């Protein structure tokens, strides 16, 4: 949920200092991931009208725009992108077992414990019900084919901060692990003495890299200050003195 908002209004609003707050709540609901929290409509082969682009036209046209990456001629969420969502499932629901709630089958849910009644798909965003789910990573297996998820503004702007929260998928895998790790056995990140970091790259209007900001989502490495995964929305300040 980019940039702080002091209200629960469902609009991208102009603040008193001239800055804009994007809440994701005034996006067209037809862009929402569904019909389940797996986000089947984010893929071309699931039999639903596919969503590949999300954008905000309030108060300006294409104030915010993000499109899924196209790899090998196919545009899919699995190739990297930002999905619009309001799902908030943090445990197995009726009929689900095992690691369902922290697998790709629940990849569009936010792990926001400030909402006591999970699964109602409302009020789980920072400023309302909706939020963006960022999917994209680089490792030894996919760096040759997955592009980085991107978002754009309609004109050059200074981004001052983001409200971030883990997805259920991310939180669960950090906490419990899954079989896709190097050992093939579900191992919590803490036991592996590992870390998980997100990088935010900022570019100018000509596509030149201005700066990369880094945020640790979890850190259990020896000799490092322990960082546990967040469970509510947390402000990530950037473009400020002393912020790395």
Which functions belong to the PLM regions below?
Residues 145-151, 183-188:
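Short secondary-structure capping micro-motifs at structural edges
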Residues 6-147, 154:
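N-terminal targeting leaders for non-cytosolic proteins
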Residues 173-198:
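Short coil-to-beta strand junction motifs in C2/discoidin
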Residues 154-161:
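Extended extracellular/luminal ectodomain segments enriched in beta-structured repeat modules
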Residues 164-167:
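Short glycine-rich beta-strand segments
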Residues 192-244:
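Terminal, low-complexity interaction segments
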């Amino acid at each position: 949920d980019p940039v702080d908002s002091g209200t629960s209004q469902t609009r991208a609003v102009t603040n008193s200092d001239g800055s804009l707050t994007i809440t994701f709540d005034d996006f067209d609901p037809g862009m929402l991931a569904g019909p389940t929290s797996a986000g089947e409509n984010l893929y071309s082969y699931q039999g639903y009208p596919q969503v590949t682009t999300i954008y905000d036209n309030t108060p300006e046209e294409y104030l915010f725009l993000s499109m899924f990456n196209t790899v090998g001629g196919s545009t899919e969420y699995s190739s990297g992108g930002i999905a619009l969502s309001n799902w908030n499932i943090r445990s197995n629901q009726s009929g689900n077992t095992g690691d369902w709630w922290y697998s790709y089958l629940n990849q569009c849910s936010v792990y926001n414990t400030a909402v006591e009644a999970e699964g109602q798909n409302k009020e789980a965003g920072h400023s309302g019900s909706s939020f963006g789910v960022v999917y994209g990573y680089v490792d030894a297996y996919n760096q040759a084919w997955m592009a980085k998820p991107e978002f754009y503004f309609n004109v050059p702007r200074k981004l001052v901060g983001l409200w971030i929260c883990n997805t259920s998928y991310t939180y669960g895998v950090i906490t419990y692990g899954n079989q896709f790790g190097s050992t093939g056995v579900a191992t919590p990140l803490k036991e592996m003495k590992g870390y998980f970091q997100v990088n935010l790259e900022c570019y100018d209007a000509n596509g030149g890299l201005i700066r990369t900001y880094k945020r640790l989502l979890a850190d259990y490495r020896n000799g490092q200050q322990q960082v546990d995964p967040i469970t509510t929305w947390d402000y990530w300040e950037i473009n400020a003195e002393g912020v790395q």
